């Protein structure tokens, strides 16, 4: 165990204190939730400051705080720069958020859009992609909580994993999206402050020159700008990040929840604020060589370096910052996935006549169910965080072009949209296993684009945008 690690008593006290604080905050914010609109979309009245904070904080996930250092440790400079390219997803979604709000001012989920625009077959394929990705992301966040706690203290992986799941499920259950967005605002301030302080201490204590020399001596390939696997990862991650945001109900629910005119500015600024964070967290990981840290697993390198640099007090600080980052994503994902399952699953397939109160109760039950299922899937810890997240890249990247063409072009039909998502996913998964995780997303995206272009060229349709305004397609 490192000297900088926390003893189990202090770690447990922080965990309990943190949990009580967030759960109480969630209860306080959720007291006035009276309808499914209040619970799922925060009354569709979120302003610019909170909108920007939740966009940035939600994207600062286990990926940014644990996987970005892991990839810098494995791929060097292209690892951290490549991860920062995921900011393009947020920035490119900015004009799309405005388009979504104008087309579907009363929409609830991304599934609403796909079903109305392309029909039931495409909707079914899209739901498979969305639910699979959501579970992959939830499991990665649960695993990250366990990895964080076991890296910084004597507490086990299973204790940390269980704790973050229980805390996030409780305050999401009590407060809904309103609590999620408000806690994101606080968490974004903690995260930004923490990342800056840790980076400054790293530069002051170790020094850029010493870090460069150590990497040059012991792992020179990490500084090689022509490192083939790292270059492939760079381009793959751009499309992975875009696919994650374009398809996910986490971001669509925010487009619906933000005030009219806010979404475009909020997503653009959120992306710009997020852009440097993976570079900073990745840079910290390169100091592991100078500090003589050999992490038992590559995804533990970030917390171990930060704790070593900052000492015992720093370990507390690192714990709070990374835990905030994980919570800010898990609560958003729980809320958005429960909306998707409630609206597109329960209401559409099981109880079409469900009123607002019934949907509100169903949504809360789904949040609990998602928490339990995620806990069960996290128990074995079957992969590293990087491998788990990138496995879902084939799924999400295949949905990029059907969504873009669906929003801006009348010609793409449901048959070709379905084929694009299915063939794109299959191609990405095959190449994931044949070549590696760093080609899954880009290959899925290219195959999906080829199918979409074939549809536009050989069998174009003419979708009527007014279909979104018809009574059957406007949620009650």
Name the predicted role of every residue range.
Residues 1-476:
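Membrane-embedded helix-loop-helix hairpins and adjacent transmembrane boundary segments
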